[in-house]
Amino acid sequence: MIIEITAYKEKFVEFYNSQDSKIQRKIEYVLDLVRYEKKVPQKFLKALKNTDGIYEVRVITSFRSIRILCFMDGGNLVVLTNCFLKKTQKTPKNQIKLAERLKREYLIDKNS
């Protein structure tokens, strides 16, 4: 089964477009793993505890650790919400709150 991936609002797209082509290729590689692999290794995709169904896509380069927050809409759609450079051990709460808010907005938009 192929997973469809879409970005909601502009946060992910703005971040992606601001990266150089090498980083963009790394992001695309990891998103392709999510899209095509039946079981994505946890080093690339992890459910975040104590959240409203938010997942963290992990893109690791030699100089940066990039996180893309997302959620599932049904069994075959991943919705990307926001993206950031991870600088600490824990995922910043403000980024999680933003992803949860965008998820709520997405569901309202979808159902209206």
What are these regions (language model features)?
Residues 1-65, 74-78, 87-112:
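Basic, Lys/Arg-enriched alpha-helical interface segments
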